[in-house]
């Protein structure tokens, strides 16, 4: 696996990859990789793709009081993991390459970005949309793979790709979880051993709510029960627990089509997010 750090080298190497005729896939990441990221590479390889992975800790998607400086950076270990997973190319630009002096453009996606994490983290999705658009322009992939754990992010990306007529297939890959159900996340490393035990309450509370709603139970009651369980376990604040339309992310109060149960809450100093598909019980 090659590692490239400037745009000219990236474009030359991607052009070489295209000679084989195989599709080129992009897996955007911020590093601190885990099995969830490997699953994205695996999904791309299963489609017969040459796999380009980007690692860039994007400052424009962090708020002023968030964890930009603390976010884990371990490129050597990440590169070894990607090499073992079969990635073809690692694109690892620095901040000056991505945001050179005079950079003045931001992409704002209305609607789907405005609630939930968009409300809790002002400016976050503009940063995401801008950097992902740049990565798309730099790599020009045929397909891009994103984890469903960041479900609102995936919805935002699908929205601007459709709105801007970007000819890239967007593939969502199911959330990868630890044995106790906690969604894999680079930020799980922030949890103390005690918090890590408590954190499993989040997927369990969501699972119970999803099952209740799927059985035809009252949506408001199921959401209230999940919030109460999280509060009792020590999550504070609880930003949201909501049942939403899977495409628009607008809140819904009954199952009429594809739906998602989404949640975000803080445990100690760590903000955790998760989501589950909700379907009517057979």
Swiss-Prot record:
Coiled coil: none annotated. (R)-pantoate binds at residues 61, 153. The keyword Ligase applies. The keyword Nucleotidyltransferase does not apply. Pathway: Cofactor biosynthesis; (R)-pantothenate biosynthesis; (R)-pantothenate from (R)-pantoate and beta-alanine: step 1/1. It catalyses: (R)-pantoate + beta-alanine + ATP = (R)-pantothenate + AMP + diphosphate + H(+). Its EC number is 6.3.2.1. Signal peptide: none annotated. GO terms for cellular component: cytosol. GO terms for biological process: pantothenate biosynthetic process. It is found in: Cytoplasm. It comes from the Bacteria. ATP binds at residues 30-37, 147-150, 184-187. Beta-alanine binds at residue 61. Pfam families: Pantoate_ligase. One of its GO terms (molecular function) is pantoate-beta-alanine ligase activity. The active site is at residue 37. Its main location: cytoplasm. The reaction proceeds by a bi uni uni bi ping pong mechanism. Homodimer. Belongs to the pantothenate synthetase family. PANTHER family: CYTIDYLATE KINASE/PANTOATE-BETA-ALANINE LIGASE (PTHR21299), PANTOATE--BETA-ALANINE LIGASE (PTHR21299:SF1). Catalyzes the condensation of pantoate with beta-alanine in an ATP-dependent reaction via a pantoyl-adenylate intermediate. This is Pantothenate synthetase. The lineage of its organism: Bacteria, Pseudomonadati, Pseudomonadota, Alphaproteobacteria, Sphingomonadales. The gene is panC.
